[in-house]
């Protein structure tokens, strides 16, 4: 019998965290973060982590598991999430993954890896081929393959392309999970207003100080590439004003939300629920009940 697993996904700021907590409380679950930035300690505001009170109400996993100057990849996520799922189930709880990092979620659910079944010489040859491309050419290649990334750098672009190319033929013998995918969405205007309001709320909560600490101590760390931090660095350097930097955060977040939706719709068989529907929570609740009953 396959392990039952619920995944709550969707664009940033749509309300995934609140729904995940509600489902965990109602269905005896624990939450695993499926967000590539929430793994970093001390970066709480810009990564929109669940609050201390929320984490106290429901156990959360894969949050605060890396120092800011450490790297984290889809491979790390698959390995660690797999262990957390097994541990949660062993304790008699329902694992619920909540997040919007499409590459991480797809890698876990479809069993992607670059392990022993892969021809490593072929991987190295492809890597050498990628190394001949400019950053612009790598970005264009990633875009054509509809790989969603936040603030990509050259190393992450190449790594994602390797995963995309070589994972196609090395899926496990079917996913080990019986998965219910729950997608949240909203009409574009309302979603963009949510995003803008959330950025304003983050600024009021102290995002500027959090970003300044990162700028002063770890200006070149992988963590700095998350939306909400990098946009403020030119302000700290005296190159742009604060208002312009904040607007850039909003703009980049809106663009990222659009890319997230494209990824989920094209690559994952997910049922979407509009948060503008007054009964969307009731519909999701019934879907979970039916899923757990079967």
UniProtKB/Swiss-Prot annotation:
Pfam families listed in its UniProt record: IPPT
Start and end residues of each stretch annotated as Interaction with substrate tRNA = 35-38
Its Enzyme Commission number(s) read 2.5.1.75
In chain numbering, the residues marked as site (Interaction with substrate tRNA) are: 101, 127
Q: What does this protein do?
A: Catalyzes the transfer of a dimethylallyl group onto the adenine at position 37 in tRNAs that read codons beginning with uridine, leading to the formation of N6-(dimethylallyl)adenosine (i(6)A).
Q: What protein family does this chain belong to?
A: Belongs to the IPP transferase family.
Q: What is this protein called?
A: tRNA dimethylallyltransferase
The record lists the lineage as:
Bacteria, Bacillati, Bacillota, Bacilli, Lactobacillales
């Amino acid at each position: 019998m396959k392990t039952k697993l619920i995944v709550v996904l969707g664009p940033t700021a749509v309300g995934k965290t609140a729904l995940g907590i509600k489902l965990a409380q109602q269905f005896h679950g624990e939450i695993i973060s499926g967000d590539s930035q929430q793994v970093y300690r001390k970066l709480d505001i810009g990564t929109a982590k669940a609050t201390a009170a929320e984490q106290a109400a429901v156990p959360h996993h894969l949050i605060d598991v890396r120092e800011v100057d450490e790297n984290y990849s889809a491979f790390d996520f698959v390995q660690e999430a797999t262990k957390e799922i097994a541990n949660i189930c062993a304790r008699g709880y329902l694992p619920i993954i909540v997040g919007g990092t499409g590459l991480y979620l797809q890698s876990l659910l479809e069993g992607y890896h670059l392990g022993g079944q892969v021809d490593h010489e072929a991987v190295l040859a492809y890597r050498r081929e990628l190394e001949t491309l400019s950053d612009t050419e790598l970005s264009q290649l990633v875009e054509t393959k509809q790989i969603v990334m936040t603030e990509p750098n050259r190393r992450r672009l190449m790594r994602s392309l390797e995963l995309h190319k070589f994972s196609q033929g090395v899926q496990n013998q079917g996913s080990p999970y019986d998965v219910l995918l729950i997608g949240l969405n909203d009409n574009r205007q309302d979603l963009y207003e949510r995003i803008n309001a959330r950025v304003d709320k983050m600024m009021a909560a102290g995002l500027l100080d959090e970003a300044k600490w990162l700028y002063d101590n770890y200006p070149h760390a992988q963590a700095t590439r998350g939306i909400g931090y990098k946009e403020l660095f030119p302000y700290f350097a005296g190159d742009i004003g604060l208002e312009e930097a904040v607007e850039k955060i909003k703009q980049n977040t809106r663009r990222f939300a659009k890319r997230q939706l494209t990824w989920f719709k094209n690559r994952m068989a997910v049922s979407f629920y509009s948060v503008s529907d007054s009964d969307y929570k009731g519909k999701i609740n019934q879907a979970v009940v039916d899923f757990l009953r079967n």
